[in-house]
Swiss-Prot record:
<keyword id="KW-1133">Transmembrane helix</keyword>
<comment type="similarity">
    <text>Belongs to the UQCR10/QCR9 family.</text>
</comment>
<dbReference type="GO" id="GO:0005743">
    <property type="term" value="C:mitochondrial inner membrane"/>
</dbReference>
<comment type="subunit">
    <text>Component of the ubiquinol-cytochrome c oxidoreductase (cytochrome b-c1 complex, complex III, CIII), a multisubunit enzyme composed of 3 respiratory subunits cytochrome b, cytochrome c1 and Rieske protein, 2 core protein subunits, and additional low-molecular weight protein subunits. The complex exists as an obligatory dimer and forms supercomplexes (SCs) in the inner mitochondrial membrane with cytochrome c oxidase (complex IV, CIV).</text>
</comment>
<dbReference type="InterPro" id="IPR008027">
    <property type="entry name" value="QCR9"/>
</dbReference>
<dbReference type="Pfam" id="PF05365">
    <property type="entry name" value="UCR_UQCRX_QCR9"/>
</dbReference>
<keyword id="KW-0249">Electron transport</keyword>
<comment type="function">
    <text>Component of the ubiquinol-cytochrome c oxidoreductase, a multisubunit transmembrane complex that is part of the mitochondrial electron transport chain which drives oxidative phosphorylation.</text>
</comment>
<dbReference type="GO" id="GO:0006122">
    <property type="term" value="P:mitochondrial electron transport, ubiquinol to cytochrome c"/>
</dbReference>
<keyword id="KW-0812">Transmembrane</keyword>
<keyword id="KW-0813">Transport</keyword>
<dbReference type="InterPro" id="IPR036656">
    <property type="entry name" value="QCR9_sf"/>
</dbReference>
<keyword id="KW-0472">Membrane</keyword>
<keyword id="KW-0496">Mitochondrion</keyword>
<protein>
    <recommendedName>
        <fullName>Cytochrome b-c1 complex subunit 9</fullName>
    </recommendedName>
</protein>
<dbReference type="GO" id="GO:0045275">
    <property type="term" value="C:respiratory chain complex III"/>
</dbReference>
<keyword id="KW-0679">Respiratory chain</keyword>
C-alpha cells in the first residue's frame, strides 16, 4: 500500500531520477558538465582570492620591471 502511495506522489528526487539518472548517456553528460562547471567555478574563486590577497606584490603591479633605462 505504501509503495503505491509513493509512486503516485512523486517528489523532487524521483523527478531528478527520471530526468537525469534513468539513462546512462544522460547521466554521464550530466556528470561531465557538472565537473566542468565546478572546475571553472573553483578556478575563478581561487584566482580572485589570490589576486585580492596579492595586490601590489605581483609582477604586473610593479611598473619598473621590464623597462629599459632611458639614456640621457
Amino acid at each position: 500500500m505504501e509503495s503505491a502511495a509513493r509512486r503516485s506522489g512523486g517528489g523532487v528526487l524521483e523527478g531528478f531520477y527520471r530526468l537525469v539518472m534513468r539513462r546512462t548517456p544522460v547521466y554521464v553528460t550530466f556528470v561531465i558538465a557538472g565537473a566542468l562547471l565546478g572546475e571553472r567555478a573553483v578556478d575563478y574563486g581561487v584566482k580572485t582570492l589570490w589576486e585580492k590577497n596579492n595586490v601590489g606584490k605581483r609582477y604586473e603591479d610593479i611598473s619598473v620591471l621590464g623597462q629599459r633605462p632611458v639614456d640621457e
